[in-house]
């Protein structure tokens, strides 16, 4: 990605509206999770927190939004989420993230999420859609304290599928890094997708495997044994007819699942099935319908 860095003929990195920042902190106040610190810089912003879960009325639901139509060249986004002890937080996006065509430089997004003991945090953004010629890097760093639960997911598409556009982006690179506060590594998931370049294949069995969408979900928790969580994930997908794989994470810290398919609707259904399975297993309660189209 560094090789693509350049000064575009439009607004350069660091220009107004090119650096989006979200810095949010949550704490328990009056029996429910409240947003106690907030800093936001356009184009990133949030809706005010919602408390819409009748089963867990203290959980704060936060929708992340961007004032532009999508991510453009030379955009630099950074999001920091700090979830205090015993907080309950659900973080999601308003819609899919569109990565526009780029002629110069690249765009990046960095996410830092920390969860303290007793917290239950979900970070479940909508799919990432890379347009033809786009160049994008995303790094997600998650710090999970012992006694905390974090569920983090992502969905990558091959492009604008309705237009017949598949793997026409220039570069799509993502890193997920999950660790303990003392630095103990729990999981790493790295993707480097460079269509057309030798060694940068995108259709192999370890990537898209000939499909149009790939979705992943990692659940880190010590509320139940990792094998029990993995079995719940597998059972949630067993009857859906989608290609998927489930495995436990190291040190008995949780489990993860990856799903491949060609239908955005089926992928969304699979993500919802595993979200419900994790929520029911770990809390004994279902998750609410978020009413996204």
UniProtKB/Swiss-Prot annotation:
InterPro entries: UreD (IPR002669)
Subcellular location(s) of the protein: Cytoplasm
Entry keywords, A to Z: Chaperone, Cytoplasm, Nickel insertion
Any single GO CC term annotated in Swiss-Prot or TrEMBL for this entry: cytoplasm
Purpose of the protein: Required for maturation of urease via the functional incorporation of the urease nickel metallocenter.
Family: Belongs to the UreD family.
Subunit structure: UreD, UreF and UreG form a complex that acts as a GTP-hydrolysis-dependent molecular chaperone, activating the urease apoprotein by helping to assemble the nickel containing metallocenter of UreC. The UreE protein probably delivers the nickel.
Entry protein name: Urease accessory protein UreD 2
Species in which this protein is naturally found: Streptomyces griseus subsp. griseus (strain JCM 4626 / CBS 651.72 / NBRC 13350 / KCC S-0626 / ISP 5235)
Higher taxonomy: Bacteria, Bacillati, Actinomycetota, Actinomycetes, Kitasatosporales
């Amino acid at each position: 990605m560094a090789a693509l860095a350049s000064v575009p003929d439009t607004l350069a990195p660091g220009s107004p509206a090119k650096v989006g920042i979200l810095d949010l902190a949550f704490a328990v106040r009056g029996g429910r999770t409240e947003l106690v610190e907030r800093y936001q810089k356009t184009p990133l912003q949030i809706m005010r927190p919602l408390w819409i879960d009748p089963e867990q009325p203290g959980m704060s639901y936060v929708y992340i939004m961007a004032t532009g139509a999508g991510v453009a060249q030379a955009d630099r986004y950074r999001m920091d989420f700090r979830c205090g002890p015993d907080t309950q937080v659900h973080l999601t996006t308003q819609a899919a993230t569109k990565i526009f065509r780029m002629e110069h430089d690249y765009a990046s997004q960095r996410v830092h999420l920390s969860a303290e003991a007793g917290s239950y945090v979900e970070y479940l953004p909508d799919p990432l859609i890379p347009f033809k010629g786009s160049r994008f890097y995303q790094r997600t760093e998650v710090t999970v304290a012992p006694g905390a639960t974090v569920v983090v997911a992502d969905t990558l598409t091959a492009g604008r599928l309705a237009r017949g556009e598949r793997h026409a982006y220039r570069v799509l690179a993502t890193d997920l890094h999950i660790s303990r506060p003392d630095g103990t590594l729990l999981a790493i998931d790295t993707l480097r997708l460079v269509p057309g370049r030798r060694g940068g294949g995108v259709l192999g069995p370890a990537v898209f495997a000939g499909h149009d969408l790939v979705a992943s979900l990692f659940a880190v928790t010590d509320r139940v044994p990792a094998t029990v969580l993995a079995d719940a994930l597998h059972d949630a997908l067993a009857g859906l007819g989608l290609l998927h794989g489930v495995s436990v994470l190291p040190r008995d810290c949780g489990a993860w699942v990856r799903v491949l398919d060609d239908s955005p609707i089926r992928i969304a259904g699979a993500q919802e099935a595993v979200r419900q399975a994790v929520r029911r297993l770990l809390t004994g309660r279902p998750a609410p319908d978020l009413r996204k189209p």
